[in-house]
Amino acid sequence: MLTSMKSKFDTLFNTQPEVAAFAPGRINLIGEHTDYNGGYVFPAAIELGTYGLASKRNDNKICLYSNNFESTGTIEFSLDELQFDTTHSWANYPKGMVKFLKESGYQIDSGFNILIEGNIPNGASLSSSASIEILMGWLLKALFNLEVERLELIELGRKVENQFIGVNSGIMDQFIVGMGRKDQAILLDTATLEYHYVPTEFGDYVISIMNTNKRRELAESKYNERLKECQSALALLQQELDVDALGHIDVTTFEKHAYLIEEDVLLRRARHAITENARVKEAHAALNRKDFIEFGRLLNASHASLKNDYEVTGIELDTLAETAQQVEGVLGARMTGAGFAGCAIALVHKDRIKDLEEEVTKIYKDKIGYEPSFYHVDIGDGVKYIKI
């Protein structure tokens, strides 16, 4: 890929790239919609991601091109014009990173050229947007010798998502893209940003990613609505509990104080956030003791909660996960990511991968009308520079 990208870079910009980098996508093993509720998450970086090449310019022009959106062509704007622009589509993610780096005091004193190409399926809920954000920060760090640390880039990436794009997401995606490590997941406390690397050793079992192939736009989904519902539920619980987030409430305490939330929808939203947080801790413990059956059971319970209490699945994700759960050799399956479309994951015996794909494809096509896609990817490193 890099060879063809270098040739394309020369064609587009009539110069050679000075720096190259790769930022991964991610899966979240368990812990969905807990990151903006101050809870735990359990993500891992994957070896699908976004590649980028960059060079400085002698003017103030920023020129961005994506091989994934060739029909859009080169998107150009000035270093002094960093406003959100709907016509700039994907380029708003890197534009936001430039804006917030500059506002943080980092010197980006000229324009630049950037070419990117990703192999994360677009709209698959495998975190392509965070991959682009962190990739952009990493390229600019080298290009302009910025003394910016990984954690600050992660925080700025979230700021891009929240304040520039308009999605009130948590920090999980940017964190795992920036901090991932090969063959390890991260148990992250999103309230404190304390984290632990955990080996992703599943014995004879592997994680299979199943894509609904249904597109969704996160900013236009009910993501922000769920955040508001959780905030409303938290405010009711705070009448008697001294807590800052739903993630700070254990299941027993919640059950004792659930009467404070009279509206059923708000009760269910809070119940998911709190029980899912407990499931993350239980899943971490199960993986440590190599209890893959219990880990799979927790995946199933997570999906049921996301379907019934949080209502972020939909017929496509439900068909994938619930069909996979019935396949022999599958210990558990659930949606991963924000929901509404995107992907599900299954913990499947390595000898049953073909059975999983065949059985899920048949039922999914019969019910939905088109086929899902399957990926088997290794757990990889976070953002890194690569040799040109």
From Swiss-Prot:
Location of the active site: 173
Keywords tagged on the record: ATP-binding, Carbohydrate metabolism, Cytoplasm, Galactose metabolism, Kinase, Magnesium, Metal-binding, Nucleotide-binding, Transferase
Domain of life of the source: Bacteria
Binding site for Mg(2+): 129, 161
Entry EC no(s): 2.7.1.6
UniProt GO molecular function: ATP binding; galactokinase activity; magnesium ion binding
One GO term (biological process): galactose metabolic process
Main location: cytoplasm
Binding locations of substrate: 32-35, 223
Binding locations of ATP: 66, 123-129
Annotated metabolic or biological route of this protein: Carbohydrate metabolism; galactose metabolism
Gene3D superfamilies from the UniProt entry: 3.30.230.10, GHMP kinase, C-terminal domain
Function: Catalyzes the transfer of the gamma-phosphate of ATP to D-galactose to form alpha-D-galactose-1-phosphate (Gal-1-P).
The protein, known as: Galactokinase
Species this chain originates from: Staphylococcus carnosus (strain TM300)
